[in-house]
């Protein structure tokens, strides 16, 4: 009987588990060197070298056929040329990068640089709600998983953060577009890089372009990276799936944004609120900091402050489905005094009297997460900004000069993006005036 001189870690445990009379040993959770050597051989030489190392180490074949195929398909060559690699170096790049070897002390705790606002204990919105957890299963027809996700999107009033492995559901995509374009909700979408092409194909079939996604930031992210000593490496996939609504409610589970997941696949969904949302908040910050922007899809436009009433906010946990508090009245949708603004009240630019020729002042370039921080990080406004600082080509709320500014100071942390209406310059103006505290009169 031919037996290997040495037993690998997995093979040794397997033989002991199959032997009824073998003594029960303590389970080891330490690092498996034989598995690392075999994986490095697979990256460097292919399947034959992988099997050769397994025989030499006396280890079992621990990778399935699909896993081997995935690794071979996603191998990336090192950044440097093989001619520049000197003998004895362990992945040292010619461009001055550090070693490509895996050092747990340096890589396990490494955090990407993030520009997110760090909330204090008083500012964290998820601390305002009571901690709760609810589970939904696909078999529960009264609480459908797909409809629960769609209701969460419709009840969001400020920010929607989505981490998803696959996004091809056109109906859910319409919900996201409606939230961003109609209710001025800022959407931050992280997708798995390996399945990003499915999302872009859906956008092409639906004829969705950059101009339709001005309030949506789409970025791609990968899983952890395995790197061999030779410098070859491959990245994993994103199997985490969750939605953060207004940083107060989280939906997480096995559900993917696909038609099959909503119709035939078995899935479950968790709904969290309270302190546990902080863990999802930290994970999203970490992944967003290591993500890459998707080519062809722009980030949300710069935001300007819009004041709102204290009692106008709506919690995500309620059963009603109102519009976002960031949404202003559409000037062409109604002839009421609350939705029509006078041309004389529209802000004018001191440099030019022609609104078409006047160029809006440039705002500083800020990342999407910096703009998202402004939802929670800015102090209350003392008074409305002067009209001379407004951009003349955009619609936003006008402030009555005699309105008490202290009425808004307690809740002024909502920021929305400017909107340009090019068709307004060819449309006759309404002459009926509008005031913030005006009341309709009966005639």
Curated annotation (Swiss-Prot):
Region of interest called Disordered, as start-end residue ranges on this chain: 311-403
Principal location class: cytoplasm
Biased composition annotated in UniProt, kind: Low complexity: 327-344, 388-399
Location relative to the cell: Cytoplasm
Domain of life: Eukaryota
InterPro entries referenced in this protein's UniProt entry, alphabetically: FAM83, SACK1
GO biological process: cell population proliferation; epidermal growth factor receptor signaling pathway
Composition-biased stretches (Polar residues): 315-326
Keyword Iron in annotation: no
SUPFAM superfamilies hit by this protein: Phospholipase D/nuclease (SSF56024)
Keywords assigned: Cytoplasm
Transmembrane segments: none
This protein's GO CC annotations: cytoplasm
Coiled-coil regions listed: none
GO molecular function: protein kinase binding
Keyword Repressor: no
Xref: Pfam families: SACK1
Family the UniProt entry places it in: Belongs to the FAM83 family.
Role played: May function in the epidermal growth factor receptor/EGFR signaling pathway.
Protein name: Protein FAM83A
Gene that specifies this protein: fam83a
């Amino acid at each position: 009987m031919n037996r290997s001189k040495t037993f690998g870690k997995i093979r040794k445990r397997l033989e002991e588990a199959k032997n009824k009379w073998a003594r029960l040993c303590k389970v080891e959770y330490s690092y498996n060197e034989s598995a690392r050597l075999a994986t490095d051989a697979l990256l460097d030489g292919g399947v034959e070298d992988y099997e050769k190392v397994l025989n030499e180490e006396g280890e079992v074949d621990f990778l399935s056929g699909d896993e081997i195929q995935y690794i071979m398909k996603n191998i990336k060559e090192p950044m440097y040329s093989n001619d520049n690699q000197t003998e004895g170096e362990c992945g040292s790049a010619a461009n001055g990068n550090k070693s490509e070897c895996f050092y747990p002390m340096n890589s396990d705790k490494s955090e990407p640089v993030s520009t997110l606002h760090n909330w204090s204990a008083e500012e964290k919105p998820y601390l305002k709600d009571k901690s709760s957890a609810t589970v939904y299963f696909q078999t529960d027809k009264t609480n459908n998983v797909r409809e629960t996700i769609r209701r969460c999107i419709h009840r969001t009033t400020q920010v929607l953060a989505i981490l998803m492995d696959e996004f091809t559901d056109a109906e859910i995509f319409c919900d996201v577009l409606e939230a961003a374009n109609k209710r001025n909700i800022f959407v931050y979408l992280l997708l798995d890089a390996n399945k990003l092409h499915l999302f872009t194909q859906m956008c092409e079939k639906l004829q969705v372009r950059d101009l339709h996604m001005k309030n949506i930031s789409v970025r791609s992210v990968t899983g952890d990276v395995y790197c061999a000593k030779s410098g070859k490496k491959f990245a994993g996939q994103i199997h985490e799936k969750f939605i953060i609504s207004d940083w107060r409610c989280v939906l997480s589970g096995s559900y993917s944004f696909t038609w099959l997941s909503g119709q035939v696949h078995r899935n479950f969904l968790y709904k969290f609120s309270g302190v546990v949302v902080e863990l999802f908040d930290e994970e999203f910050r970490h992944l967003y900091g290591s993500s890459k922007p998707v080519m062809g899809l722009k980030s949300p436009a710069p935001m300007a402050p819009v004041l709102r009433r204290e009692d106008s906010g709506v919690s995500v946990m309620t059963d009603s489905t109102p519009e976002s508090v960031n949404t202003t009245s559409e000037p062409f949708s109604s002839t009421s005094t609350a939705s029509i603004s006078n041309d004389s009240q529209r802000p004018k630019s001191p440099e030019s009297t022609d609104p078409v020729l006047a160029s809006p002042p440039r705002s500083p370039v800020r990342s999407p997460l910096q703009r998202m921080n402004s939802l929670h990080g800015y102090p209350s406004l003392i008074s409305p900004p002067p009209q001379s600082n407004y951009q003349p080509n955009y619609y936003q709320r006008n402030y009555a000069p005699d309105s008490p500014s202290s009425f808004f100071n307690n809740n002024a942390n909502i920021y929305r993006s400017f909107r340009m209406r090019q068709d307004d310059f060819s449309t006759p103006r309404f002459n009926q005036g509008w005031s913030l505290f005006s009341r309709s009169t009966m005639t």
